[in-house]
């Protein structure tokens, strides 16, 4: 091939390559234009559709990597608009209690990362129910779980997770530093109250939607404490009860009215012969009913009922079916304190229906074992020990602990009444078992006007753990 032919050949090849490159560029421009046209056209359509948003989060914890996949269904038109929870409905008529949740936290914690907790409780907004709990700043089966039988420490915090889930670092939300707490939702935001600090100078920190709004200082300098269950919201105002003073004698008890995290009114109860601790409260036809723990001298439970102006009435559940623990055998009740085996106690609850009462109580008279619900049709006002219905939920051979009430508002359930519910703490570890830690799981039930069943839903963990050996 002579030089002229070489030049012609090279030129032809370059021309062909250039033409191909030009064609590819034109195709690329056309593709981009078509894609842009499709996206612009999609934005002009406003039809209702369901979207699924999948979020992937990588996090590392104790040299192990976890991938949390959160699949959130977003349904167009679903109401997430804030509403004011009215709280003016009456309690739903019920025949028994259906199992609602069980978190199995201790069983899962033998191998997984689960918080050491106590004092769990449940509270619901108009959109969801959450389990709140007081952590010990430690995980199960870890060295920092040692000594967590202690009630008050600077490591304790109020946290929350979706109801029915074991409380872990991966599904829990921090709420407040606290060794005593309560929380509730007014339809627009969460109110949390966390008490922390030294016994003689404790301070309650109020938060609304996570922002500090006010503080309340201990006024008797003797372990300021609150409910360990949900506060109550009615027509935009939330209500809670705090105690300050001795646990074995007369103390000071105050009701607080709170709006958007700010205290608008408070009163001190005039109750010199009563003792109110760890009250379990619920709304009923626009008023608030609280059933509490008498740690001083009553084996039946004291109650306080008040309206939105904090005008109140006080008393004790009259039934001879006694609700506290320890307690004597059922017998003759009293509308004042029943002094037999009245010292000490445990957090509990009851629901009033006219002259009748659903009494939730530990089955054992002397130790925190078993749990049962009893319907006494005249127990709010009469002192006999006859009852109509008994439903077992934890067997006498299994550990129980604190219990408390919570409600599901009509704005959540779609019912025209307030659904009564309760939770039971299932305490494991010290001081009754040979471990270095104390923690608990929980179960919960809601009232239904249909068939229910007797059974036992125990904690079920096999102890001791590896850390205990």
From Swiss-Prot:
Q: What is its EC number?
A: 3.2.1.18
How does this protein sit in the membrane?
Answer: Single-pass type II membrane protein
The positions annotated for binding Ca(2+) are 294, 298, 324, 344
So which cofactors does this thing need? Ca(2+)
**Residue spans, topological domain Intravirion:** 1-6
Keyword set, alphabetical order: Calcium, Disulfide bond, Glycoprotein, Glycosidase, Host cell membrane, Host membrane, Hydrolase, Membrane, Metal-binding, Signal-anchor, Transmembrane, Transmembrane helix, Virion
BP terms from Gene Ontology: carbohydrate metabolic process; viral budding from plasma membrane
Question: How is this chain modified after translation?
Answer: N-glycosylated.
Q: According to the UniProt record, where is the region Head of neuraminidase?
A: 91-469
- InterPro entries listed in its UniProt record: Glyco_hydro_34, Sialidase_Influenza_A/B, Sialidase_sf
Virion surface face of the membrane: 28-469
The record, for SUPFAM superfamilies, names:
Sialidases
Q: Where in the cell is it found?
A: Virion membrane; Host apical cell membrane
Q: Where is this region: Involved in apical transport and lipid raft association?
A: 11-33
The record's active-site residues are: 151, 402
Region (Hypervariable stalk region) spans which residues? 36-90
One Pfam family name from the record? Answer: Neur
Single annotated GO MF: metal ion binding
Report one GO cellular component.
Answer: virion membrane
Residue positions binding substrate: 118, 152, 277-278, 293, 368
Disulfide bridge partners, by residue number: 92-417, 124-129, 184-231, 233-238, 279-292, 281-290, 318-335, 421-446
Transmembrane stretches in the record are 7-27
Report quaternary structure and partners.
Homotetramer.
Entry function: Catalyzes the removal of terminal sialic acid residues from viral and cellular glycoconjugates. Cleaves off the terminal sialic acids on the glycosylated HA during virus budding to facilitate virus release. Additionally helps virus spread through the circulation by further removing sialic acids from the cell surface. These cleavages prevent self-aggregation and ensure the efficient spread of the progeny virus from cell to cell. Otherwise, infection would be limited to one round of replication.
**Name of this chain's protein:** Neuraminidase
The organism's taxonomy opens as:
Viruses, Riboviria, Orthornavirae, Negarnaviricota, Polyploviricotina
């Amino acid at each position: 091939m002579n030089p002229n032919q070489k030049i012609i050949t090279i030129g032809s090849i370059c021309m062909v390559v250039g033409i191909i490159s030009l064609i590819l560029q034109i195709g690329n421009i056309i593709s981009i234009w078509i894609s842009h046209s499709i996206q612009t056209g999609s934005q002009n359509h406003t039809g209702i559709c369901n979207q699924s948003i999948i979020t992937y989060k990588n996090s590392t914890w104790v040299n192990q990597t976890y991938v949390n996949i959160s699949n959130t269904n977003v349904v167009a038109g679903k109401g997430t608009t804030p509403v004011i929870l009215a709280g003016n409905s009456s309690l739903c008529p019920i025949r028994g209690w259906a199992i609602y949740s069980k978190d199995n936290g201790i069983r899962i914690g033998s191998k997984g990362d689960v918080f050491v907790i106590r004092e769990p409780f449940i509270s619901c907004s108009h959109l969801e129910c959450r389990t709140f709990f007081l952590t010990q700043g430690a995980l199960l089966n870890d060295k920092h779980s040692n000594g967590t039988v202690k009630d008050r420490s600077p490591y304790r915090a109020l946290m929350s997770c979706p109801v029915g889930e074991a409380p872990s670092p991966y599904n829990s939300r921090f709420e407040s530093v606290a060794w005593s707490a309560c929380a509730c939702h007014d339809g627009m935001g969460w109110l949390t109250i966390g008490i922390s600090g030294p016994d003689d100078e404790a301070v309650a920190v109020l938060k609304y939607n996570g922002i500090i709004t006010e503080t309340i200082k201990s006024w008797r300098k003797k372990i300021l404490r609150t409910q360990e269950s949900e506060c109550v919201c009615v027509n935009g105002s939330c209500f809670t009860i705090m105690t300050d003073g001795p646990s074995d004698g007369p103390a000071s008890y105050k009701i607080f009215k709170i709006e958007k995290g700010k205290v608008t009114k408070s009163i001190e109860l005039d109750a010199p012969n009563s003792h109110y601790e760890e009250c379990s409260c619920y709304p009923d036809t626009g008023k608030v009913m609280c059933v509490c723990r008498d740690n001083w001298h009553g084996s039946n439970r004291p109650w306080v009922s008040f309206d939105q102006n904090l005008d109140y009435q006080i008393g004790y559940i009259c039934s001879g079916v006694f609700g506290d623990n320890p307690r004597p055998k059922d017998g003759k009740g009293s509308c004042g304190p029943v002094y037999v085996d009245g010292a000490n106690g445990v957090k509990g609850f009851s629901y009033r229906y006219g002259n009748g009462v659903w009494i939730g109580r530990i089955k054992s008279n002397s130790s925190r074992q078993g749990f049962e619900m009893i319907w006494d049709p005249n127990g709010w006002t009469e002192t006999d020990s006859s009852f109509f219905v008994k439903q077992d939920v934890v067997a006498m051979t299994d550990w129980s602990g604190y219990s408390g009430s919570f409600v599901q508002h009509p704005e959540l359930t779609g019912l025209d009444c307030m659904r009564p519910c309760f939770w039971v703490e299932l305490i494991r570890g010290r001081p009754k078992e040979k471990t270095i830690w104390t923690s608990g799981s929980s179960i919960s039930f809601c009232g239904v006007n249909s068939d229910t069943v007797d059974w036992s839903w125990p904690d079920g963990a096999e102890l001791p753990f590896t850390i205990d050996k």
